[in-house]
Amino acid sequence: MNFVPHQYQQYCMNRIVQDPAVGLFLDMGLGKTIITLSAINELKYGRFQVKKVLIIAPKKVAEATWQREAAKWDNVSHLRISTVLGSTSKRIRALHTPADVYIINRENVVWLVDYYKNDWPFDMVVADEMSSFKNHRAKRFKALAAIRSHITRLVGLTGTPSPNGLSDLWSQVYLLDQGERLGKYFTHFRERYFEPGRRCREVVYSYDPKEGAEKAIMDAISDICVSMKSEDYLELPEIVYHDIPVALSAKAQRDYNELEKKMVLDLGDDHVLDVTSAAALSNILQQLANGAVYTDDGGWQEIHNDKIEAFIELIEQLNGKHAIVFYNFRHDLDRLIVALQKTNLHVRQLQTSVDELDWNAGKVDVLLAHPASTAYGLNLQDGGNHVIWFGLNWSLELYQQANKRLHRQGQKNRVIVHQLICEGTRDEDLARALLMKDAAQQYVMDSLKARVDKYRRQQ
């Protein structure tokens, strides 16, 4: 596919190419990945200014997102990518595989720095989700800071760099400029811009920004950080679709394939796939992709948690921005609630008018809803502008109407629809079907028949 950058994307690409260190503060779904890959390509093959690039990302992003995006666009499809994940031996093998770009998950940054020590080979580093380094006491921050002088170029990507307050900015900016703008020590930064807040005698529990601190900090970092507001994206459509590929683990993929094969073959060799049997089979395959299936006793059994992990990473990357999450099955809801309990977010299931009012009043961080319960009549545009589809629905009408709960008159920001798509599963069929609009239902049937035929031929 040919990549024609929007004006703001071209500006960001130019900043990466021209500046040795830059932080890009852009909403998810606005193209940070292709912006960065295009800049990497220009620096490596257009200007010959970088040799080896390291991308540090959340685990599920490291597994699939960058690889899928590189394969999608013609201008960067030639970039060789090595994924540094798995056991120690697999990671070492990946590091010694010839490539242009190496991708590692943030949990292994400490290991990577220790592995190379002073023989650090990456002259360009991209921190995808820079806020992962917001804690100046964390080992991963200290590890990256220790080898910062060996890095010629550093790019920090995030949607919201300071989800918990201005103090989060120090460590991220330090990695960019090694203390030039906000100081070389966190204590000095805090003394300059903050004053003690909640305290008990000599013990200070929190610090509050001094008057004018926010403006002073933003002015200090404005030359090294690109922060864009919604008005900067005026050229974009009012609704943006953001597909997030989810790579299943090897075991999860095997389990999915075996269960899919069993379900298909249980139909029998001479069974004609009609609407009823197709709906039942598609329903089960959708459950498998989401990570759980109903059991005969009315309960459910978890098959994998890869999509749940990707969902939590997505929530983390939103950095407190409110989102409505659409689920399909009861076990989706149960698993989402359990996963979200580990966060400090205010989570609510959409059940009554009170939930609707609280969402629109900004009192709810994550609103869990079934698309059928929001199809008509609800106005949810005041509570946020992010939609997350944990599992897609084959009904184009339900899909469009659910998205319109936020994408409607009164919405002050562009709506971004995030869709979690498990690779190699029924998810991919549904995503393609929804793009076909009027032909969606026929494609749902055709794609299912293709899966059935594949397994029957293998017998």
What do these predicted regions represent?
Residues 1-142, 146-150, 186, 190-209, ...:
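SF2 helicase/translocase NTPase motor core
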Residues 52, 78, 124, 141-230, ...:
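Conserved P-loop NTPase motor "coupling/switch" region that bridges the ATPase
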Residues 132-135, 156, 408:
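Residues immediately C-terminal
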Residues 168-171, 379-392, 416-419:
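A short beta-strand element within the Helicase C-terminal
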Residues 237-248:
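Short amphipathic
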Residues 285:
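Conserved, function-defining core regions and hallmark residues within catalytic/recognition domains
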Residues 326:
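Regulatory input/activation interfaces that engage signals or partners
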Residues 395-413, 434:
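Conserved SF2 helicase motif VI
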